[in-house]
Amino acid sequence: MIEETLLEAEEKMEKAVVVAKEDFAAIRTGRAHPAMFNKIVADYYGALTPINQLASFSVPEPRMAVVTPFDKSALRNIEQAIRDSDLGVNPSNDGNIIRVVFPELTEERRKDYIKVAKTKGEDAKVSIRSVRRKAKDAIDKLIKDGEVGEDEGRRAEKELDDTTAKYVAQVDELLKHKEAELLEV
């Protein structure tokens, strides 16, 4: 029973780290990359659809992305969704593809993105700690109900704390890399 609780907690913590990676990838740096478009949704026949399901992305130059819609009728909606996103870009289309040129990041914009990254990192750590708290409550309940011994419960809590520290450290490491990437001129 304790092993299941610990395993479930670790899986949820792993998911929190994966979400943090995705969030960090969506934050714009000085270079273009396809992951920047992952969180953008466009209206496609009345349904909000992630644009990574509506188009393919390529990066022919460090500061330019080319978006090729699978369905040409979605071109205008995809372009509008990119324009309305928080990427701070003005896409242009030639009727077949959308070109997105990324301007150089100003120092002020870099600092804003670092704040966003720190917020996303803190959200991930809060999520990890929440998983830890729920797992600890489950372990305490098992001890209280007499299903496991006090010593076994304390060992499980120590293992849970070690797992929590490991995943929080992973988020800190991801954040450190993202900050370095953002400060790179």
UniProtKB/Swiss-Prot annotation:
SUPFAM superfamilies: Ribosome recycling factor, RRF (SSF55194). It comes from the Bacteria. GO terms for biological process: translational termination. GO terms for cellular component: cytoplasm. Pfam families: RRF. One of its GO terms (molecular function) is ribosomal large subunit binding. InterPro entries: Ribosome_recyc_fac, Ribosome_recyc_fac_dom, RRF_sf. It is found in: Cytoplasm. Keywords: Cytoplasm, Protein biosynthesis. Belongs to the RRF family. NCBIfam families: frr. Responsible for the release of ribosomes from messenger RNA at the termination of protein biosynthesis. May increase the efficiency of translation by recycling ribosomes from one round of translation to another. This is Ribosome-recycling factor. It comes from Streptomyces avermitilis (strain ATCC 31267 / DSM 46492 / JCM 5070 / NBRC 14893 / NCIMB 12804 / NRRL 8165 / MA-4680).
